[in-house]
């Protein structure tokens, strides 16, 4: 079957090759599906169909077979080249598929390697900066943030199992803060911007730090809470629920009380409701500053003390049970009460400064009003003086115009007066000489 098929295909090549040798080269570069070499590797059924088609052709196409058989070695070389090209194409396709699968797997491995390498570098940098942290303690996570002081110190917050550290380098100044996790007494969310909640407060017994510009505040807060497991889940002032003292007060109060006690407790309820409204107003406001939160904590502690005192006076029989409860709450929140006391002192100092500020502002307002009135008065006086000067200049002008006509006569009269004065002086001199001569004569006669 192969021997019969070769001449017929060779005839086709013979008619194409002598006319245009370039076409043979183009056909040699085609794929295996378009080249005649694919016919040689086809099934016997396809070969039978092709033989029938070739038998139907004209005898002129089959007549030059002897000459083609003479050229069969060249055609065999072409066929071998085509088979090689088809094999090379198949190998290239398989290589491309392998490259695609490798390229799909490469990004995942690269990401894992890059994340592990970045974590390793961050851990090394963390232990290099903070030598007090043991090298066996790995870094959990680092966050970019800024420490709020007189200016913002941009840096990084490092969190490990037992340490919370911050490092910043601004204007060549290194700022390092190391906070042991067990010494943290308060972790609170706060706002320094109007719209973006981006700040956290970390407080100890002695210090208080505000970290702002946190891109993922919630994740940072959760990680810090997990590290500081000794803290309570809710911070003071963040929950809108009533305080523990108020809850205990409402739980211990019986349903039926005398009329006098009802009046007293109604007053206390009004105070508590007012405090609660203040707390809700602070929590519903768009921006919360640390000062407002501090004042809110002070109000809560103040309301608790008022409730405790009033309850001790109204119900002496249950005072012992209530006193037993209060120290437990105080034992749990001793650092928070220490902070609230300091905040209360600051609040008192600020309240004392407020009247002085009011008096100074009133004094400055009075001075400004006096200056405004004096400026108006000076302006009025200047206008009146300008009017008077205008009148005087007009009078002088009219007087000059009136005296302009007899100016010639006046000059003549003045000239005559001067002449008369000169003559009179000359006569007086002569009279004096005569008098002197007469006196001399009289003296000589005597």
Curated annotation (Swiss-Prot):
Biased composition (Polar residues): 234-247, 282-292
Record PTM Phosphoserine, positions in chain: 239, 256, 266
Region named Disordered: 1-120, 234-253, 276-298
Cellular compartments per GO CC: cytoplasmic microtubule
Xref: Pfam families: GRAM (PF02893)
N-acetylmethionine modification, residue list: 1
InterPro entries in alphabetical order: GRAM, GRAM_domain_protein_2B, PH-like_dom_sf
Domain of life, per lineage: Eukaryota
Keywords: Acetylation, Phosphoprotein
Annotated GRAM domain residues: 124-191
Entry keyword Acetylation: yes
Compositionally biased spans, kind Basic and acidic residues: 95-113
PANTHER family reported for this sequence: GRAM DOMAIN-CONTAINING PROTEIN 2B, GRAM DOMAIN-CONTAINING PROTEIN 2B-RELATED
Name of the protein this chain belongs to: GRAM domain-containing protein 2B
Annotated organism of origin: Pongo abelii (Sumatran orangutan)
């Amino acid at each position: 079957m192969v021997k019969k098929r070769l001449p017929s295909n060779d005839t086709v090549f013979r008619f194409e090759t002598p006319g245009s040798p370039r076409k043979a080269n183009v056909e040699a570069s085609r794929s295996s599906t378009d080249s005649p070499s694919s016919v040689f590797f086809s099934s016997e059924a396809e070969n039978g169909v092709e033989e029938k088609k070739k038998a139907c052709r004209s005898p002129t196409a089959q007549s030059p077979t002897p000459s083609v058989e003479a050229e069969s070695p060249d055609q065999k070389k072409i066929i071998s080249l085509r088979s090689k090209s088809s094999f090379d194409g198949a190998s290239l396709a398989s290589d491309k598929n392998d490259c695609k699968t490798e390229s799909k797997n490469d990004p995942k491995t690269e990401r894992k390697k890059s994340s592990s390498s970045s974590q390793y570098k961050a851990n090394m940098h963390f232990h290099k900066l903070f030598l007090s942290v043991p090298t066996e303690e790995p870094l959990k996570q680092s966050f970019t943030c800024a420490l709020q002081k007189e200016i913002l110190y941009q840096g990084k917050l490092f969190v490990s199992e037992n340490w919370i550290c911050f490092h910043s380098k601004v204007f060549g100044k290194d700022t390092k803060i190391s906070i042991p996790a067990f010494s943290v007494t308060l972790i609170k969310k706060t706002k320094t911007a109007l719209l973006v909640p981006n700040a956290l407060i970390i407080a100890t017994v002695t210090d208080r730090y505000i970290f702002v510009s946190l891109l993922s505040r919630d994740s940072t807060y959760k990680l810090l809470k997990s590290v500081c497991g000794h803290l309570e889940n809710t911070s003071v002032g963040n929950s809108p629920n009533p305080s523990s003292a108020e809850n205990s007060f409402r739980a211990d109060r019986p349903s039926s009380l005398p009329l006098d006690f009802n009046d007293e407790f109604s007053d206390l309820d009004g105070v508590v409701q007012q405090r609660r409204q203040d707390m809700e107003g602070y929590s519903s406001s768009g921006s919360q500053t640390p000062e407002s939160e501090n004042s809110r904590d002070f109000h809560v502690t103040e309301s608790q003390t008022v409730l405790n005192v009033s309850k001790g006076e109204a119900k002496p029989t249950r005072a012992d049970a209530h006193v037993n409860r209060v120290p437990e709450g105080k034992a749990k929140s001793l650092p928070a009460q220490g902070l609230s006391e300091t905040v209360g002192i600051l609040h008192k100092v600020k309240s004392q400064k407020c009247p002085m500020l009011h008096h100074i502002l009133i004094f400055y307002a009075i001075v400004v009003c006096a200056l405004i009135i004096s400026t108006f008065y000076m302006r009025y006086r200047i206008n009146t003086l300008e009017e008077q000067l205008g009148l005087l200049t007009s009078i002088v002008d009219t007087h000059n115009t009136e005296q302009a006509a007899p100016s010639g006569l006046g000059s003549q009269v003045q000239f005559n007066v001067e002449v008369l004065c000169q003559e009179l002086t000359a006569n007086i001199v002569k009279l004096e000489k005569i008098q002197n001569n007469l006196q001399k004569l009289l003296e000589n006669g005597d």
